Each structure stands twice: as C-alpha cells, then as structure tokens.
A protein has these predicted regions:
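A membrane-topology feature that recognizes alpha-helical transmembrane segments
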Residues: 1-146
Length: 146
C-alpha cells in the first residue's frame, strides 16, 4: 500500500513507472503482433481442412504467444533474456543479431518506444486515476491492432 500512496503523490515516479511498464508491454506486443496472425492462419487452415473433410496437417511444434522462445528469423539463434530488454538491447546489439549479425527490424524498438512514450503521456495527462488504466489498456490494444 505504501508504493501505491507513493505513486499517487509523486507524479514523476508514476510517469516513470508507466514508461517502464509501457516498454515492457511494448516488448510483449511485438510478440503478439508477430505471432497472432500466424496462429490465426494455422487455426483457419485447420478449420478449413476439417470442413472440407481433408486429413489434418500434423503440427511440427507448439506455436503460441509463449512457445517457442523468440529467435532470429534468419539463423534461428534463440534470443537470450539480456538480448530481449526493450530498446536497450537493440542499442547494445547495434540493431543486429548477436549470432549472425543480420539486421533486426527497426519495427521492434519503434513499437516498444511508442508504447513507452504513449504510456508515459497517458500517465502524465490523466494522473493516478482509473482513467489512466483504461486508457493504457485501450492504447496498448490499438497499438497491437495497428
């Protein structure tokens, strides 16, 4: 409860926490943006095969928002936790895969930055209110859909 009171009475701390939370959510949204269309496509294909009474295609591996772990699309290098820190790891790796040195799309840090900046602005504009929570959820959802 002490933390809640502190955040409610210190706007800078609240906005800073909102920015950090926004960066983390932005990192997760990158996963959603990349994987959800692929998951839907697989599901639609399976449904179509069922309706057309065709044999199902065996799925090679589990593919959802959690599994498999993130990896480089070029070389398959599994991304380590320290390579997955929002924005900072992109700068540290100079925008390239640590294994094959293939450039990483600028979309990833831009989504993270946009989410962090928008979250900070919302926290600053609405303050420590229920509207902030509602606007954050709406903004994150819209960002994922865009």
């Amino acid at each position: 409860m002490l933390t809640v009171d502190f955040l409610a009475s210190h706007a800078l701390a609240f906005v800073s926490c909102a920015v950090l939370l926004g960066l983390l959510v932005g990192s997760f949204l990158n996963v959603v943006i990349y994987r959800l269309p692929k998951m839907l496509h697989r599901d639609w294909q399976a449904q179509a095969r069922e309706v057309l009474e065709m044999p199902p295609v065996p799925q090679a591996e589990t593919f959802n928002l959690v599994l498999p772990n993130s990896c480089c699309p070029q070389c398959g290098h599994e991304i380590k936790p320290w390579e997955n820190v929002p924005v900072i790891s992109y700068l540290f790796l100079r925008g390239k895969c640590s294994n094959c040195k293939t450039p990483i799309s600028k979309r990833y840090p831009l989504v993270e930055l946009a989410c962090g900046v928008l979250s900070g602005y919302i926290a600053w504009h609405f303050g420590f209110t229920w509207q902030t929570g509602a606007m954050l959820a709406l903004t994150w959802g819209l960002l994922a859909m865009s």
